Regions:
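Alpha-helical elements of the RecA-like P-loop NTPase motor core of helicases
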Residues: 17-18, 115, 157
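Conserved phosphate-coordination/catalytic loops
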Residues: 10, 108, 171, 175
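Conserved Radical SAM active-site core
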Residues: 1, 123-124, 128-200
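Glycine-rich beta-alpha loop elements in corrinoid/cobalamin-binding modules
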Residues: 1-96, 100-107
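N-terminal [4Fe-4S]-dependent radical SAM core
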Residues: 77-145
Length: 200
């Protein structure tokens, strides 16, 4: 529905870095057609090339899933299985006659990669668009919370963390966590305690 040229799914640091590296090298944006952890609307020629490589799954179309619960469930099963693999397959699903191609995710981040992401100078403040909306209960709950890792193998029915962050756990280094805790103590609203040290 979005008609986007390229979508990045999940936690996007690795695909964003790859996209930016290629653009910096002068690769035209319209040529970015096979980057891991992205989705594109593909031509039939591109779909044929993907199928020729053999590492793909054809999902039931969106339209079929709207009228067939079993087809929808089968698609979900494929997505769940592929999200629990080190080397997942490419997924192909048709929607309104167009092929949506979802490339496999990047490998789980290394400690150095996840540290580089978490060590950026975040403001720890809500987006400015919320400025005049009063308190944000969820923000108040996590304001002084520290993530020690990303990913979850659980797949609980009430939670989508594994869909966003993957089922493989990537852990931060002790030093990265300690640095964040020290930074928290300088926050003007810090009251002397950390509400949570844990997962996503």
């Amino acid at each position: 529905d979005s008609k986007a040229d390229l979508l990045i799914y999940g936690m996007g640091e690795q695909p964003i870095i790859e996209v930016l590296k290629l653009l910096k090298k002068g690769v035209p944006f319209h040529s970015l057609r096979n980057i891991r952890q992205t989705a594109i609307i593909a031509s039939e020629e591109e779909v044929a090339k993907i199928r020729a490589k053999g590492n793909f799954i054809d999902l039931s179309s969106h339209e079929v899933c709207l009228s067939d619960k079993k087809a929808f469930a089968a698609n979900f099963k494929h997505i769940e299985r592929e999200s629990n693999k080190i080397d997942a397959q490419t997924l192909i699903q048709y929607h309104q006659g167009k092929a949506i191609v979802i490339f496999p995710p990047f490998p789980t981040m290394t400690e150095a990669q996840i540290d580089a992401s978490f060590d950026l100078p975040y403001t720890r403040m809500p987006h400015p668009k919320y400025k005049n909306r009063g308190d944000i209960p969820a923000y108040e709950m996590i304001k002084f919370s520290v993530n020690m890792h990303r990913g979850c193998f659980g797949g609980c029915a009430f939670c989508t963390i594994s869909a966003h962050q993957g089922k493989f756990v990537a852990s931060r280094s002790k030093q990265s966590i300690v640095n964040e805790v020290k930074e928290l103590t300088n926050h003007p609203e810090f009251k002397g305690y950390i509400s949570d040290l844990g997962g996503p």
